[in-house]
């Protein structure tokens, strides 16, 4: 009888060990993520691993940010989202995220944003970033699939970030974030609009799909961008 009981305990412990999720867990604002090893996830976040990164290219000095974590999000399979917002010839933002179900994500690509071509592009978009819409009204000709206009507010902060530019962001991302008033890790997006060839942003039709953690890097990046404005 004792042998059966011992065998049952071994089976339970083996299953528990197999089910334990290990993810890379770090935030580059707090500590280095370089060569970071995966560690066991807390009991309240054992479904997926997530990886978020962004860089801001301004001249020859890119600013890099990344965040890796455990998550309860069921992303159904490994998903990767990335897009770029070009503000000027020398100012470009690149955003990238991964959600990996039941396994660690690959390290983010460390892609450095580079400036989009300007001058004879087939798009004309508002392109700037600032603390409010009145301080953000420049336009530029550029290459890209669509124009974007983003307004983000920050919990426990009085600052608002306005970001506009040319972007290769997908329609699905526009629709996911375009419902408005979506909050991600202390950042509320009051507006995320996409359109084509306009000087006054007109939103694409959107559907309310709720908060999606796979797009969180944009929120995290916005915190980084806010620090650039202070």
From Swiss-Prot:
- GO BP terms, alphabetized: defense response to Gram-negative bacterium
Keywords in alphabetical order: Cell membrane, Glycoprotein, GPI-anchor, Lipoprotein, Membrane, Secreted, Signal
- Is the keyword Zinc assigned to this protein? no
User: Where are the GPI-anchor amidated serine lipid anchors?
Assistant: 211
Residues making up the signal peptide according to the UniProt record: 1-20
Q: Which GO terms describe its cellular component?
A: extracellular space; plasma membrane; side of membrane
* Principal location listed in the UniProt entry: membrane
Q: Where in the cell is it found?
A: Cell membrane; Secreted
User: Which residues are sugar-modified?
Assistant: 37, 44, 74, 77, 90, 106, 110, 132, 137, 156, 168, 181, 197
- Propeptide position ranges: 212-230
The record places domain UPAR/Ly6 at 125-172
| Membrane topology label | Lipid-anchor; GPI-anchor
Q: How is it modified after translation?
A: Highly N-glycosylated. Not O-glycosylated. GPI-anchored. The GPI-anchor is cleaved, leading to secretion into the colonic lumen.
Q: Does the record's keyword annotation contain Glycoprotein?
A: yes
PANTHER family associated with the record: LY6/PLAUR DOMAIN-CONTAINING PROTEIN 8 (PTHR20914), LY6_PLAUR DOMAIN-CONTAINING PROTEIN 8 (PTHR20914:SF2)
Q: What does this protein do?
A: Secreted protein specifically required to prevent invasion of Gram-negative bacteria in the inner mucus layer of the colon epithelium, a portion of the large intestine which is free of commensal microbiota. Prevents invasion of flagellated microbiota by binding to the flagellum of bacteria, such as P.mirabilis, thereby inhibiting bacterial motility in the intestinal lumen. Segregation of intestinal bacteria and epithelial cells in the colon is required to preserve intestinal homeostasis.
Family, according to the entry, reads as follows: Belongs to the CNF-like-inhibitor family.
Query: What is this protein called in UniProt?
Result: Ly6/PLAUR domain-containing protein 8
Q: Which organism is it from?
A: Bos taurus
């Amino acid at each position: 009888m004792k042998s059966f009981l011992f065998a049952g305990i071994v089976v339970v412990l083996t299953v528990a060990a197999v089910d334990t999720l290990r993810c890379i867990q770090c935030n580059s604002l707090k500590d280095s993520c370089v060569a970071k090893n995966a560690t066991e996830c807390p009991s309240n976040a054992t479904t997926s691993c997530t990886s978020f990164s962004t860089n801001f290219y301004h001249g020859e000095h890119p600013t890099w940010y990344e965040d890796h974590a455990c998550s309860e999000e069921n992303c159904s399979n490994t998903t990767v989202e990335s897009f770029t917002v070009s503000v000027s010839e020398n100012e470009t933002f690149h955003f990238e995220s991964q959600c990996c179900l039941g396994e660690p994500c690959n390290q983010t690509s460390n892609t450095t944003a580079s400036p989009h071509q300007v001058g004879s592009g087939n798009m004309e978009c508002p392109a700037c970033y600032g603390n409010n819409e009145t301080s953000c009204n420049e336009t530029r000709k550029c290459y890209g699939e669509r124009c974007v206009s983003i307004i983000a507010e920050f919990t426990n902060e009085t600052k608002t970030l306005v970001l506009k530019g040319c972007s290769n962001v997908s329609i699905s991302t526009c629709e996911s974030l375009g419902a408005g008033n979506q909050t991600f890790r202390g950042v509320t997006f009051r507006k995320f609009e996409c359109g084509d060839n306009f000087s006054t942003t007109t939103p694409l039709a959107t559907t309310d799909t709720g908060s999606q953690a796979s797009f969180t890097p944009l929120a995290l990046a916005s915190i980084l961008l806010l620090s650039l404005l202070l």
